[in-house]
């Protein structure tokens, strides 16, 4: 029968094989075609690395199946894995190691079962069948290990309309994951969602654990309006500044925009609207500040109790 072998460069090789061929045999055929020594080849199918002595039939590899060929780099490399407790583990790996392999190495060192491990790199959760090379993880890169809590937990998400959504999550879920769950329930695209907890806007690549969001915590969902709006900021000297903002911008964001325009550090700014001083972690929407509203900027004098 015919099978296909796809390399990391995207090239696809066609091989004539039999179900009874061993993985060694397949590697020898690849060497004949491509000149790559078998000891530098790793073959992956359905997220599993294939062992030399086993047959294609053992792995249920049928006609026109596609295997993935990853090159085994000579000598390997070190990477670091940082846990939520701050401990750093050093691992000896190769670029061609799959995430499963890495989790197995962590289990060997730390005793944590792979099914309780979530690995994060550059804000992305790593999938078991992919390789370190797939994620461009290079020597001395640092991965973050989050424990997958058995059974998960419930959190609440409150919208500006007052509706409360209940979500089943785990501490190791990223903010991206949470936004995807909200999309599943409410149909709101993630790029229109801003999530706020304890006055902070939550960043996509971080986890609930990073923000100490625990069971039955309540997040606030603010919709990111496409295109935004203009508001005005009036100073005590009578000058009026125009800002481009979104309802979901926090007061911190607005102060940063004022700093960009006027050079006034945020810690010297006080913003007043409708007679109220605005708090940094809250959003414009929280204060019902709409397009063409006018805020008043008062400077906070250094050293004073004002």
Swiss-Prot record:
For this protein, the record's InterPro entries field holds: Ubiquitin-like_dom, Ubiquitin-like_domsf, Ubiquitin_CS, Ubiquitin_dom, Ubiquitin_ubiquitin-like
User: What CDD domains does the annotation carry?
Assistant: Ubl_ubiquitin
Keywords attached to this Swiss-Prot or TrEMBL record, sorted alphabetically, are: Cytoplasm, Isopeptide bond, Nucleus, Repeat, Ubl conjugation pathway
- What Gene Ontology terms describe what this protein does at the molecular function level? mRNA binding
Sorted alphabetically, which PROSITE patterns does this protein's record hold? Answer: UBIQUITIN_1 (PS00299), UBIQUITIN_2 (PS50053)
User: Location of the Glycyl lysine isopeptide (Gly-Lys) (interchain with K-? in acceptor proteins) covalent cross-link?
Assistant: 76
What's an example Gene Ontology biological process for this entry?
ubiquitin-dependent protein catabolic process
Provide GO CC annotations from the record.
Answer: nucleus; plant-type vacuole; plasma membrane
- One Pfam family in the UniProt entry: ubiquitin
Localization (cell): Cytoplasm; Nucleus
Coarse class of the protein's main subcellular location: cytoplasm
Limits of the Ubiquitin-like domain: 1-76, 77-152, 153-228, 229-304
Q: Which positions correspond to the propeptide? A: 305-306
Q: What does this protein do?
A: Ubiquitin exists either covalently attached to another protein, or free (unanchored). When covalently bound, it is conjugated to target proteins via an isopeptide bond either as a monomer (monoubiquitin), a polymer linked via different Lys residues of the ubiquitin (polyubiquitin chains) or a linear polymer linked via the initiator Met of the ubiquitin (linear polyubiquitin chains).
Concerning PANTHER family, the annotation shows: UBIQUITIN (PTHR10666)
The misc remark on file is: Ubiquitin is encoded by 16 different genes. Ubiquitin is generally synthesized as a polyubiquitin precursor with tandem head to tail repeats. Often, there is one to three additional amino acids after the last repeat, removed in the mature protein. Alternatively, ubiquitin extension protein is synthesized as a single copy of ubiquitin fused to a ribosomal protein (either eL40 or eS31) or to a ubiquitin-related protein (either RUB1 or RUB2). Following translation, extension protein is cleaved from ubiquitin. For the sake of clarity sequence features are annotated only for the first chain, and are not repeated for each of the following chains.
Q: Which family does it belong to?
A: Belongs to the ubiquitin family.
Q: What is this protein called?
A: Polyubiquitin 3
Question: Could you tell me which species this protein originates from?
Answer: Arabidopsis thaliana (Mouse-ear cress)
The protein's gene is named UBQ3
């Amino acid at each position: 029968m015919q099978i296909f072998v796809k390399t990391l460069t995207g090239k696809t090789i066609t091989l004539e094989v039999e179900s009874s061929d061993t993985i060694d045999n397949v590697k020898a055929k690849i060497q004949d075609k491509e000149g790559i020594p078998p000891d530098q080849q790793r073959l992956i199918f359905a997220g599993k690395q294939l062992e030399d002595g086993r047959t294609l039939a053992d792995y249920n590899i049928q006609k026109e199946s596609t295997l993935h060929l990853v090159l085994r780099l000579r000598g390997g490399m070190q990477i670091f894995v940082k846990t939520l407790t701050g401990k750093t583990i050093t691992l000896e790996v190769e670029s061609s190691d799959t995430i499963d392999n890495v989790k197995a190495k962590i289990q060997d060192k730390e005793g944590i079962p792979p099914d309780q491990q979530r690995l994060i790199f550059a804000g992305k959760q790593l999938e078991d069948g992919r390789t370190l090379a797939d994620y461009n993880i290079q020597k001395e890169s640092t991965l973050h290990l989050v424990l997958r809590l058995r059974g998960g937990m419930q959190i609440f998400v409150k919208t500006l309309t007052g509706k409360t959504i209940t979500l089943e999550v785990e501490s190791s879920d990223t903010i991206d994951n949470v936004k995807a769950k909200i999309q599943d329930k409410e149909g709101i695209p993630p790029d229109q969602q801003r999530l706020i907890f304890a006055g902070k806007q939550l960043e996509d690549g971080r986890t609930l654990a990073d923000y100490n969001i625990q069971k039955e915590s309540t997040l606030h969902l603010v919709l990111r309006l496409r295109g935004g709006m203009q508001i005005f900021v009036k100073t005590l000297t009578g000058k009026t500044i125009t800002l481009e903002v979104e309802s979901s911008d926090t007061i911190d964001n607005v102060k940063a925009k004022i700093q960009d325009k006027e050079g006034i550090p945020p810690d010297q700014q006080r913003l007043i609207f409708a007679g109220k001083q605005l708090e940094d972690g809250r959003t414009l929407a929280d204060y019902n500040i709409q397009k063409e509203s006018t805020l008043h900027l008062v400077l906070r004098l250094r050293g004073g109790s004002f």
